[in-house]
Amino acid sequence: MSRRTEKVASLLQQELGAILEKEYPRGGPLLTVVEVKITADLGLARAFVSIIGNEEERAETMEFLNDETKNIRRILSSKIRHQFRRIPELEFREDLLYEKASRIEELLRSVRKESGENE
């Protein structure tokens, strides 16, 4: 990524996080914008979100984000339009790193427990 796309991605991550926190306060799962990846032409921004909750809550949250993408983009546009000629299209994707890390931690605990029992 070029320096410009990195700066744009960082700005979008901050602004999207603020929008989701202020404009869409929701009870339920914790939602965090973990990373934003943007295409070289600045036309598409993929926002990776971490959702801490059960499977149903995560699915509902992703459905909500996908349904509200146009409204979120409109709010984003009003906040950063003075910095960009064109606001990138938004795409939300779930970041499963937290779940993968939890699963690895769980596996490590079970291995430690088994090795402790076998000694």
Curated annotation (Swiss-Prot):
One Pfam family of this chain: RBFA
Domain of life: Bacteria
Alphabetical keyword list: Cytoplasm, Ribosome biogenesis
An MF annotation (GO) of this entry: ribosomal small subunit binding
Function: One of several proteins that assist in the late maturation steps of the functional core of the 30S ribosomal subunit. Associates with free 30S ribosomal subunits (but not with 30S subunits that are part of 70S ribosomes or polysomes). Required for efficient processing of 16S rRNA. May interact with the 5'-terminal helix region of 16S rRNA.
InterPro entries: KH_dom-like_a/b (IPR015946), RbfA (IPR000238), RbfA_dom_sf (IPR023799)
Protein name in the entry: Ribosome-binding factor A
GO biological process, one term: maturation of SSU-rRNA
PANTHER family: RIBOSOME-BINDING FACTOR A, CHLOROPLASTIC-RELATED
